[in-house]
């Protein structure tokens, strides 16, 4: 993003997590995720929205590992059998949540300004802003990961899909083996920023932005070095 890039150059190097640069965001949108869940006025769409909102509410109130599908059905005001027709597991509900986040990112449109790094920064911050209202719930879900290896594998697969989408939206190829490698690298960057994001209480998410900017800069530096070495060897 050109405005962000100019601000970064004017303020020097990105701050560290211990002393982050107070970056200013210039977002055109402030996405509301909850409206993205429903796929229609009724039927499966309304069940999906009710299930996701109930799951997040329960995760925010207590340990996600203790939440059952029965708890989610009761919180959503749905018969358990009705819920299970659409979502046979908690993992399936989290998948619906992530698809809602993907829709929110896509609905905000493309980013065409700045370098590839700037575009990726904008798109990943767009995703984190959409997650912001649910940070407490998501931190509870993340804390339960060691007890749910199947859920972790499914979550990693969904994250790779989301990162491939992010690359494509930024105008970077996500096809073939090179695209998969890029998606895995971007997923690693994104995942490494989440612990900072969980704890970032600043009004403008400045600590999160500084951490993300620094990690993307590291990846950019490594890729530039690898390209230079490849040319030197040919």
Residue locations for each model-derived region?
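Amphipathic alpha-helical packing segments from all-alpha helical-bundle domains
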Residues: 150-172, 180-192, 210, 218
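Amphipathic alpha-helical interaction segments
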Residues: 50, 71, 122, 126, ...
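C-terminal peripheral helix-coil segments that are non-catalytic and often amphipathic
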Residues: 2-13, 18-31, 168, 199-234
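Hydrophobic alpha-helical connector segments
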Residues: 96, 109-143, 147, 157-158
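Helix-turn-helix
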Residues: 50, 54, 58-92, 96
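Basic, helix-initiating cap at the start of DNA-binding domains
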Residues: 2-11, 19-62, 70-71
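An extended, acidic
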Residues: 128-131, 139-154, 163-166, 186, ...
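Short, basic, alpha-helical segments at the C-terminal edge of helix-turn-helix-like DNA-binding modules
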Residues: 98-105
């Amino acid at each position: 993003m050109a405005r962000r890039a100019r601000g970064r150059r004017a303020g020097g190097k990105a701050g560290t997590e211990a002393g982050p640069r107070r970056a200013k965001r210039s977002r055109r949108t402030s996405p509301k995720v909850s409206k993205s869940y429903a796929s229609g006025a009724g039927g499966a769409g309304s069940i999906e929205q009710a299930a996701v909102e109930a799951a997040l509410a329960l995760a925010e109130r207590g340990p996600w590992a203790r939440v059952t599908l029965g708890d989610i059905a009761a919180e959503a005001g749905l018969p358990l059998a009705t819920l299970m027709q659409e979502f046979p597991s908690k993992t399936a509900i989290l998948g619906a949540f992530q698809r809602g986040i993907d829709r929110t990112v896509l609905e905000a449109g493309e980013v065409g300004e700045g370098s590839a790094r700037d575009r990726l920064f904008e798109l990943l911050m767009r995703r984190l802003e959409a997650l912001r209202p649910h940070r407490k719930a998501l931190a509870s879900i993340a804390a339960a990961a060691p007890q749910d290896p199947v859920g972790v594998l499914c979550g990693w697969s969904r994250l790779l899909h989301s990162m491939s989408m992010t690359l494509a939206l930024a105008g970077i190829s996500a096809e073939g083996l090179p695209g998969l490698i890029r998606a895995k690298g971007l997923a690693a960057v994104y995942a490494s920023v989440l612990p900072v994001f969980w704890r970032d209480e600043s009004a403008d998410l400045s600590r999160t932005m500084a951490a993300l900017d620094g990690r993307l800069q590291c990846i950019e530096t490594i890729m530039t070095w690898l390209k230079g070495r490849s040319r030197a060897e040919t």
